[in-house]
From Swiss-Prot:
Listed InterPro entries: PCRF (IPR005139), Pep_chain_release_fac_I (IPR000352), Pep_chain_release_fac_I_sf (IPR045853), Prokaryotic/Mito_RF (IPR050057), RF-1 (IPR004373)
Top-level taxon of origin: Bacteria
Residues with PTM N5-methylglutamine: Q239
SMART domains in UniProt: PCRF
The name this protein goes by in its record: Peptide chain release factor 1
Segments crossing the lipid bilayer: none
GO molecular function: translation release factor activity, codon specific
Subcellular localization, as worded in the UniProt entry: Cytoplasm
Gene name of the record: prfA
Modification after translation, per record: Methylated by PrmC. Methylation increases the termination efficiency of RF1.
Length: 364
């Protein structure tokens, strides 16, 4: 991006910030809690950018002053050397601010701030794939606990041999989707199963779908499109589950999506959870259809994130996790312990780099 274009956009952001501050001081807005909260949130988002913009302007002024001082001291070699050293430091700081503010101005995914439904399905590999699905669920649970999110299983289909054929996890918190969206895809594991007597390494897979939660307003569901059944639950509820049908079996007839929810204590709670999962699934379908063209253009760059795409391999023998999108290796044990910051931050950086390249191409 041309520097003049960057400055113009930053000035626009600064003006918007000032307008928001004026609105916050308006007594009429102060008497409207919802509007006040919305404006305060927007102001909070812009504040770091405006602070960096002011730093950039100050740095430009310091560079200009240093260059003028350099002209005045051309005959003083010692002073000239000191000024040149200062200019190098200032130019480096300016470049850092340019990079930081340019990234901050990139288009934001409006879904990034949402909580998510995380769906994990056992793939190829039989019972070992089911066990692997459970391992992934624990990995995300540990990561969620580490960053302060609320993580709860809302639907699960257990395997007779251990693990899960399928499970859905609700992850609630600030900007959950912005972090976990990079986990969508096929996760492959290479290890010796506990039941393997010959010590042979088996390869199994599990697919992860990351679905941003949808509001009822965004996804309209016709009640006539639903087929709802009940069953005795094997989930929470103590002895009550043996006597009362608390589980919900929900079928969305137009799409064939079926949701079986057992984890809550009452039929009403399970029904609400099932509807929440269904909305997230339908919202995901809407997003896929709406973004099909964009994803096809991005395929060769960062991948689609579809469930059919292998994104990561976990090799137990070599204690190595390979992220195929990044072309990078990470230590296996910390990853499985929920220490995902390094790999997620690398994915974010890769995405930002692609967006910067796209942005530069649009400008040119």
């Amino acid at each position: 991006m041309e520097y003049s274009t960057l400055i113009a956009r930053l000035k626009t952001a600064s003006v918007s910030f000032e307008n928001l501050e004026v609105q916050l001081a308006d007594p009429d807005i102060a008497n409207d809690p919802k509007k006040l909260e919305s404006i305060a949130r927007e102001r909070s988002k812009l504040e770091p950018l405006v602070i960096d913009f002011n730093k950039l302007l100050d740095t430009d002024k310091e560079i200009e002053d240093s260059k003028n001082l350099l002209k005045e001291n051309r005959n003083d070699k010692e002073m000239e050397s000191l000024i040149n050293e200062e200019l190098i430091i200032l130019e480096e700081f300016k470049n850092e601010l340019i990079q930081k503010t340019t990234i901050a101005l990139l288009p934001k995914d409006p879904r990034d701030e949402r909580s998510v439904m995380l769906e994990i399905r056992a793939g190829a590999g039989g019972s070992e794939a089911c066990i692997w699905a459970g391992d992934l669920a624990r990995m995300y649970e540990r990561y969620g606990q580490k960053v302060g999110w609320s993580v709860k299983s809302v639907s699960a289909s257990e395997s007779d041999m251990g693990g899960f054929k399928e499970l859905v996890i609700s992850v609630k918190g600030d900007s959950v989707y912005s972090q976990l969206k990079f986990e969508a895809g096929v996760h492959r594991v290479q290890r010796v199963p506990a039941t393997e007597s010959q010590g042979r390494v088996h390869t199994s897979t599990a697919t992860v779908a990351v679905m941003p939660e949808a509001d009822p307003v965004e996804v309209k569901i016709d009640p006539t499109d639903l087929e709802i059944g009940t069953a005795r639950s094997g989930g929470a509820g103590g002895q009550n589950v043996n006597k009362v049908e608390t589980a919900i079996d929900l079928l969305h007839k137009p799409t064939g999506i079926r949701v079986f929810c057992t984890q809550e204590r009452s039929q009403l709670q399970n029904r609400e959870r099932a509807m929440e999962i269904l909305r997230a699934k339908l919202y995901e379908i809407q997003l896929k259809e709406a973004n099909a063209k964009e994803r096809s253009q991005r395929l060769s760059q960062v991948g689609t994130g579809d469930r059919s795409e292998k994104i990561r391999t976990y090799n137990f023998k070599d204690n190595r996790t390979t992220d195929h999108r990044l072309g990078s290796n990470f230590s296996l044990e910390p990853i499985l312990a929920g220490q995902l910051d390094e790999v997620i931050n690398a994915c974010i950086a890769q995405e930002q780099k692609r967006m910067l390249e796209d942005f530069a191409n649009e400008i040119n």
